[in-house]
Amino acid sequence: VDRYNELMMNYSDETADEGAKLQDMIDSQNLWDLENQVEMAMDALRCPPGDSAVTGLSGGERRRVALCKLLLSQPDLLLLDEPTNHLDAETIAWLEKHLRDYPGAVMMITHDRYFLDNVTGWILELDRGRGIPYEGNYSAYLQAKAKRMQQEAREDASRQKAISREQEWIASSPKARQTKSKARIRRYDELVEAAENRRPGDAQIVIPVAERLGRVVIEAENLTKSYGDRVLIENLTFKLPPGGIVGVIGPNGAGKTTLFRMITGQEQPDSGSVTVGETVHLGYVD
């Protein structure tokens, strides 16, 4: 766009062809209002100011900047992995509308059921090595899957009855292995194989007994953390008791991830201290 404006300010016959090509490209990609689109997207996704240093951004802010850049590039196929992570309710509402109006194809992985309901037109379920498509949103998928599971249960019951009959025939018939009976035996083998394929695998998670916790679990005293002039946490003091379950809430960029990173030792506070009890073993997913 800047190059086109430059050519128009210094228009000549020599630059006419280049100007025409640029105009066609700008028209096809709807770039005339690009700057306004960028501002609107950054505001909707609550991105930090455009001149902010990336090194000073929180994890949530970096993710929103990356999402903003991806959406504005408008690829033919948009692949999104948990797009609602680090987004608040208003931002998710904007993203839902943006994706419903998106000119290309969108494929996403998400555990946000409400987001799936409001955006998707197809659901692809991966089940025991198969991909099963369903037309409709998540609610429609649940209804269709329930019907499919009922049908599969009827088919499984019918298959088991057929297997039982064939087992009785094989055991009782002295002529079961004659040439004319081999086709029936093959059919029996096929039924058994189909039943094995339908049988879900067993999964087991073993959680060992934890050591006894001491009096100190996690304690913070006068914890302070800043990035440049931006203060995220100031003089924070708390004690987490044994067995306590705490939800950390706050707007994007408030310092939630930074607090966790200080607890796990991935970042150090500017002042104050975090103490993790000697008997405490931390487990986390970043």
Swiss-Prot record:
UniProt cross-references to Pfam families, sorted A to Z: ABC_tran, ABC_tran_Xtn
Annotated keywords: ATP-binding, Crown gall tumor, Nucleotide-binding, Transport
GO molecular function, one term: ATP binding
GO BP term (any one): negative regulation of translational elongation
Segments crossing the lipid bilayer: none
UniProt superkingdom: Bacteria
Classification via InterPro entries: ABC_tran_Xtn, ABC_transporter-like_ATP-bd, EttA, P-loop_NTPase
ABC transporter domain: residues covered: 21-85
Keyword Disulfide bond included in the entry's annotation: no
Family: Belongs to the ABC transporter superfamily.
Function in brief: The induction of virG by growth under acidic conditions and by phosphate starvation, in the absence of plant inducers, is influenced by ChvD.
PANTHER family: ABC TRANSPORTER-RELATED PROTEIN (PTHR43858:SF1), ENERGY-DEPENDENT TRANSLATIONAL THROTTLE PROTEIN ETTA (PTHR43858)
Protein name, per record: ATP-binding protein ChvD
Species for this entry: Rhizobium radiobacter
Gene name of the record: chvD
